[in-house]
Amino acid sequence: TVANSTQLFWSVNEPFEDRNGNTLAWTGIVFAIGSLIWLIMIIIPAFDPAVLQAHESGAIDSNEEVKEFVDYLKPKEGFFITPILVYANVGIFLLMFFMGFGFMSFNSKDLIIWGANYGPLTMQGEWWRLATNTFLHGGFMHLAANMYGLLFVGIFLEPLLGRMKYVGIYLLTGIIASAASLWWNDTVVSMGASGAIFGLYGAFIALILTRVFPKEMGAGFLVSMFIFVGFNLVMGLIGNGIDNAAHIGGLVSGFLIGLALYPSLKGTFKMDGVNEKEESVDEDE
């Protein structure tokens, strides 16, 4: 038997940072894990003495490396969608900032108004929140960590998939991740691109395991992916304010999509990162 009881619910509009603990500590953790990933990417590939000699002799200008990084933020053939997604996420964040909603953190009430995923509203017909919340972030560090992860995976994955497949995976897995978050806890205000980014990482892992990428590249990529994914999932288990349901939903759906795409992508990847098969398709899009 179940006794009748009265339950009272009330909304909590606390700043997003209050659910994330020590912001300074999280800042250090984010950059530490990012540095570790890049270190692994450097150590595992074969060492090239010629490149080292060129650096030591001054033949390679150090400023060129900075210019190369900035160039990654410019839409171009083979890498068009990722910068656009970064601009969209950063643009919305800056708009909220200049309108006075905050910087390091935003209030949950304001995030709901801007389109965050909130069960009582989403399930009453505002299904568009499953998509719009993926372009909102709870604060600066939330945005910075996600954009770092997006650029890292986009550099390698977008040239292989092409524009339509890439943006399709991003949007679809982002919506699935939002639905997973809603299913797990429909009273939480959730937002962020991490579900969609985990979807891209899931697809990336699937293509690494199916040997779409050359063997000499796969080892470094795979270790980096597992460190990034594992770290975030563990932090979601031991910390507050991390939506592991969205992360897992995006990761699993992305992995399955990657497996489904494998037959059409097998043997199309070149070492310079340009996909010949998809290059011709992109020109028609």
Regions found by a protein language model. Name each.
Residues 3-284:
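A detector for small-residue-rich transmembrane helices and their helix-helix packing motifs
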